[in-house]
């Protein structure tokens, strides 16, 4: 119950999963904790993810990318518009890579906006927004509104459906840098996946700047 109170969850609701987060000051810094509850026949199971900015937030130079891969990323983020898509299995560090790219692009002259589910790390200078599908605020509705905020860089936590994919491509074609993740087995799988989602094939060459597939070596 204490964890649910800290996370602003309903303590009397044990029948459905709930998600929340709380922040505490420890070791001289603020540390966020993401909480997920899951109902079982013998009680609720709780998973807590520690989000320590000093550990989770990395620069591009700390991602372990070297040689041609590092050069391709450096060239891609210098382009004035286009999409950079990161693929890989769950837990492979896709979000870490996105945050590294965002920090590289983040400066006082650049309007950076993000749509996340949820916001993992709060970064100074970024305009971060958490989608809430339960009230109709999802990636699709968020993307429609975000382009009216005069963004230079748009980060979408994940492209999950065809409508989000089409809006992201349109944003990339209209002068924005778009960063996102996609679930495919490899980087070459991005193209057929987007086409399968309903994106017109002729739009991809002019909208895709970089497709990056990664794995986490443990």
Region spans (language model):
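Short, flexible helix-loop junctions that flank or precede catalytic/ligand sites
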Residues: 1-218
């Amino acid at each position: 119950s204490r964890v649910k109170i800290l996370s602003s969850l309903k303590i009397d609701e044990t029948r459905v999963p709930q998600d929340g987060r709380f922040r505490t000051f420890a070791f001289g810094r603020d540390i966020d904790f993401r909480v997920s509850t899951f109902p079982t026949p013998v009680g609720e199971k709780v998973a807590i993810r520690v989000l320590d900015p000093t550990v989770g937030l990395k620069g591009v130079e700390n991602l372990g990318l070297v040689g041609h891969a590092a050069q391709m990323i450096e060239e891609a983020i210098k382009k004035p518009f286009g999409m950079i898509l990161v693929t890989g299995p769950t837990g492979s560090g896709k979000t870490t890579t996105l945050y590294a790219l965002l920090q590289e692009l983040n400066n006082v002259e650049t309007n950076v906006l993000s749509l996340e589910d949820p916001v993992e790390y709060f970064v100074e200078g970024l305009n971060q927004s958490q989608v809430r599908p339960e009230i109709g605020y999802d990636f699709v509705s968020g993307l429609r509104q975000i382009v009216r905020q005069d963004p230079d860089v748009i980060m979408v936590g994940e492209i999950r459906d065809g409508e989000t994919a089409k809006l992201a491509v349109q944003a990339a074609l209209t002068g924005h840098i778009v960063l996102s993740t996609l679930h495919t087995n490899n980087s070459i799988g991005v193209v057929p996946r987007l086409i399968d989602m309903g994106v017109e094939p002729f739009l991809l060459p002019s909208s895709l700047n970089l497709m990056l597939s990664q794995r986490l070596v443990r």
